[in-house]
Amino acid sequence: MVETKFKRNAGILMPVSSLPSPYGIGTFGKDAYDFVAFVKECNHKYWQVLPLGPTTYGDSPYQSYSAFAGNPYFVDLDMLIEEGFLLKSEVIARDWGDGVVPVNVSEDDAINGRFGTYRDGNIGDDRYVSYEKVYNNRFDILRIAYNRFKAACIESKKTLAKGLPLYKQFDNFVKDNADWLEDYALFMALKSYFNNVSWGEWETDIKFRKPEAMRHYEEQLSDDIGYWKFIQFEFYRQWTALKKYANDNGIEIIGDIPIYMGYDSVDVWANQGEFQLDENLTPIKVAGVPPDAFSDAGQKWGNPLYDYEKMEANDFSWWRKRMKASARLYDVIRIDHFIGIVKYYTIPADMPDARQGEYRQGPGQKLLDAINESIGDKKIIAEDLGVEVPEVAKILKDNGYPGMKVLEFAFGGDRKNPHLPYNYTQNLVCYGGTHDNETLLGFFENRGDWELGYAYDYLDTRDKIGRASCRERV
């Protein structure tokens, strides 16, 4: 048994996308720094974020184009304005989803908050993200920033941190991250070139990564490739500064990584031999979970499954790189659907649902040994919710990983419910709710009288329920 790396403490789960922002979605800007200050003021230790990768259709952070790249939506536009790559007036002239857009605003008025005349668009709600409007505007505005960035590099007049010339900082970033950035930037440029269809529908030669086709598109799409590299340069620079600020204030960042990649991702396209694909590069088996009390058909997620035999033959090289990259981004790494490392559910890709699936043994400790070697002293949280797999408890104990409990699940059963705090064992992380739950306020607004009564009696309070539930978690 390995001793846990955690000490008793508390934190807050706050998706970056949910931070306040005038530009449609939360970013790494001022409000993120204010949130760090809030976490510190609460005497908490941790800020947990959802996966930071670029999202695909459906906008779920658990379906990403890359295990290594960052979400362009989180690049703060005000910081780009400060750097001289954007004008305030051209940023606020976009409809980011609240339905109110200034028109005919000078740059001076924009900077000083004097917006003058407004027009009403399709009235939105600033409590929610309008992903359609963010998508339609964010990439265009980042393209403007990229063009000014290129001009600044050519002129070699602008400098950033420590006086290092801008082009040199960018070149260093590209060089240091070449093992994933080159494929990612080409992949995204190709996505745009082929009208955003899945890579499985691209022209045959580039789909199969034939060397001549790779060279052809690298040359033809060189400017687009530079654009996608620039976005990652800004993402990583802004996130690194924010994380340093958090760490300097005693706050650690808990990151979240999905166990599986989506089929339409650069990781599958660039590592075709390490996934269960047929000769046409179509998934043979896909991920999901079996039928249970909540679903007669189970859940067919559709993610291509890893070919763990080939991965092991390569010393789990992709996993090592992935976890090493995650260790640079985060102080603690939460692995979603951790059970899948020990035992995974496999479904024939041509089946309509998960009823025809079966369990297969995962790599277990072999993969975890590679992960532990890759992340050094960084900590791991294992999301072990759902189907109980006896082998998981031993794996967690052997590695010192804490599992999870969810307080919102605690009051719907009897006294043996494992999510009730008095049934907790040592070395676990208790969440009020996860990204799959409603908010704590929503929980108390939407539960029936019996479940609420149980919660009130257990927490011994009715008028300060939020504070009491937080007390139980810590």
Q: Residue spans of the language-model regions?
A:
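Conserved, well-ordered alpha-helix/loop/beta-strand core segments that scaffold catalytic motifs
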Residues: 228-261
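N-terminal catalytic cores of NTP/NDP-binding nucleotidyl/phosphoryl-transfer enzymes
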Residues: 11, 15-36
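Surface-exposed amphipathic alpha-helices with a cationic face
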Residues: 40, 239-247, 372, 396-397
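Alpha-amylase-like alpha-glycosidases and glucanotransferases acting on alpha-linked glucans and related
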Residues: 2-8, 15, 21, 59-232, ...
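Outer-envelope exported proteins of Gram-negative bacteria
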Residues: 50, 252-254, 258, 332, ...
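Catalytic domains of carbohydrate-active enzymes, especially glycoside hydrolases
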Residues: 5, 30-55, 329-330
